[in-house]
């Protein structure tokens, strides 16, 4: 019975600790939406580059990445 108050206090302390989501974001964190924009831009540039008449499509000079 001596351990019961200690156990209750520990459970209350564990329940009151802040979760991982409660911590503030640093200024250098970049939201994932900005990365999606970069992917779309790269896809658009690749489409433009491949659609121009630079050489035979089988040649590597017509493809990016």
UniProtKB/Swiss-Prot annotation:
Pfam hit, one: Chi-conotoxin
Signal peptide from the UniProt entry: 1-22
InterPro entries referenced in this protein's UniProt entry, alphabetically: T-conotoxin (IPR031565)
Keyword annotations of the record: Amidation, Disulfide bond, Neurotoxin, Secreted, Signal, Toxin
Compartment(s): Secreted
Tissue: Expressed by the venom duct.
GO cellular component labels: extracellular region
Propeptide residue range(s): 23-52
Major location (coarse): secreted
GO terms assigned for molecular function: toxin activity
Modified residue annotations for Isoleucine amide: 64
Keyword flag Signal: yes
PTM comment, free text: Contains 2 disulfide bonds that can be either 'C1-C3, C2-C4' or 'C1-C4, C2-C3', since these disulfide connectivities have been observed for conotoxins with cysteine framework V (for examples, see AC P0DQQ7 and AC P81755).
Domain notes: The cysteine framework is V (CC-CC).
Family to which the UniProt record says this protein belongs: Belongs to the conotoxin T superfamily.
Protein name: Conotoxin TsMRCL-05
Biological classification of the source: Eukaryota, Metazoa, Spiralia, Lophotrochozoa, Mollusca
